[in-house]
Amino acid sequence: MIQLDDVCFAYDDRPILSHLTETIEPGQAVLLSGPNGSGKSTLLRLLNGLIFPQQGTYSFDGTIITAGKMRDHAYSKWFHQRVGYVWQNPNSQLFCSSVREELAFGPVQMGLKPADIRQRVDDALELLGLTRLASRPPYTLSGGEKKRTAIASILTMNPQVWTMDEPESYLDADGLAWLEDFLPSLKAAGKTLIIASHHADRLGSLIDKELVVRGS
């Protein structure tokens, strides 16, 4: 369970999140909506333990997430196995020397057996249509190929919670059609989805509730 209690966050003196209180139950699909600059991306970074409330608390499965907690290597590893983050711009997410290495990075950090890692990577490459690109450096890919690689790199970790910032960005028509099938399959598998998007119409009946992020 994710619990936000009176969460506030500001950049310099500019309030971004203001007294946000919300509970997200396991298996729910939540749409984060609001205008550009309202704090949707900031909230996603906070949910991933990259930044922390300046007031109030964020709890994940009953544990309050703080900078000190995330400096605990064992806890940070446990947390990041359970919460995955697909960035809006895949260039912010991809850093390995090949697509295959990108998809293997998370499972390697999780300590999975080599055979299990290969299976996860091969399955994700096939599902995302990336098999022919497996040896390519991510920087040589098109925007849509990068975005699919970014999604696949989270898929191989199989997190319980998927946080996504504009997951449809960079995708072409075929990629969007694939995404519209993929997201319901995650929900059917019991995953929690937290999606920032300006395209609620594409999410249809997937969404259980909408959280309007209003900034200050």
Residue ranges of each PLM-predicted region?
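Catalytic Walker B motif of ABC-type/P-loop ATPase nucleotide-binding domains
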Residues: 162-166
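Conserved ABC ATPase signature
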Residues: 137-141, 145
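Conserved ABC transporter NBD signature motif
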Residues: 56-68, 79
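The feature captures the beta-strand-to-loop junction immediately N-terminal to the Walker
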Residues: 33-35
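Conserved ABC ATPase "signature" region
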Residues: 115-133
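Helix-to-loop junction immediately C-terminal to a conserved catalytic motif
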Residues: 48
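H-loop/switch region of ABC-family ATPase nucleotide-binding domains
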Residues: 197-198
